Amino acid sequence: MNLFIVSDIHGMYKQFDKILQHWDEESLLVILGDMIDRGEYSYEVVQRVMSLQQEFPDKVIVLKGNHEDMLMYYVDGRMKDPTPFLINGGIEMLRSFIKDIDEEAVTHNAEILKTQFAAEIDFLRNARHYYQYGKLLITHAGFDSTAENWQDTSNQDFLWIREHYLQPNQTGLINIFGHTPTRNMHKIDDSWISPCQSYINIDGGCAYG
């Protein structure tokens, strides 16, 4: 089966919709997380992904990203200072979900998400941390490339790790990931492939223009 993998949508619904026009519904659609924040349409993106998974339950795989992870900390009241979350795209996400939002009512907004958008929050909370398909290891951020067994990677590292690709890939698998914009790695937005061809980054930085 062919795979169609999309990374780091970040609320850019129009671009996401355009990309989906190239998806053959016979192929497996894999969403690498970071569906929310930064762009104006986080709610619409989440709704679209939920609808796709409901319509094609065997053809749509959804992974969690670090931005979904931050959202869970926010709605669960585990975030001591929400400022970094809010200035890193969280406020755009809140505006997308909550109309007539009071941006100063941080705790109240979290409660609205938990109560009025429980289905969306549960969907994001229950997204996978990784997906293995044959010789492909598909993650949001990467994996612990210093561990003897990649499956010992913490959930935190699957979502947040940086520069794991600087270490040799000893898994025997090809790791496809996002999280780090490819322009930070080779100064262009095209996919980046490591010299050993066992690491592939597909985060084209759509939300950055």
What are these regions (language model features)?
Residues 16, 41-42, 72-74, 148-150, ...:
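Short glycine-/acidic-enriched loop or helix-start segments at secondary-structure transitions
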Residues 10-11, 37, 69, 143, ...:
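Short, glycine/acidic-enriched loop or turn micro-motifs at the edges of active sites
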Residues 38-128:
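Active-site neighborhood of divalent metal-dependent phosphoester bond hydrolases
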Residues 95, 100-209:
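Acidic, His/Gly-enriched loop-helix segments that form or flank divalent-metal centers
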Residues 5, 29-31, 62-63, 137, ...:
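Residue-level marker for buried hydrophobic side chains located in beta-strands
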Residues 25-27, 57-59, 134, 171-173:
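A general structural motif
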Residues 1-48, 52-54:
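N-terminal active-site segment of His-dependent metallophosphoesterases
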Residues 8, 34, 65-66, 179, ...:
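Active-site glycine-centered loops adjacent to acidic/histidine catalytic or metal-binding residues
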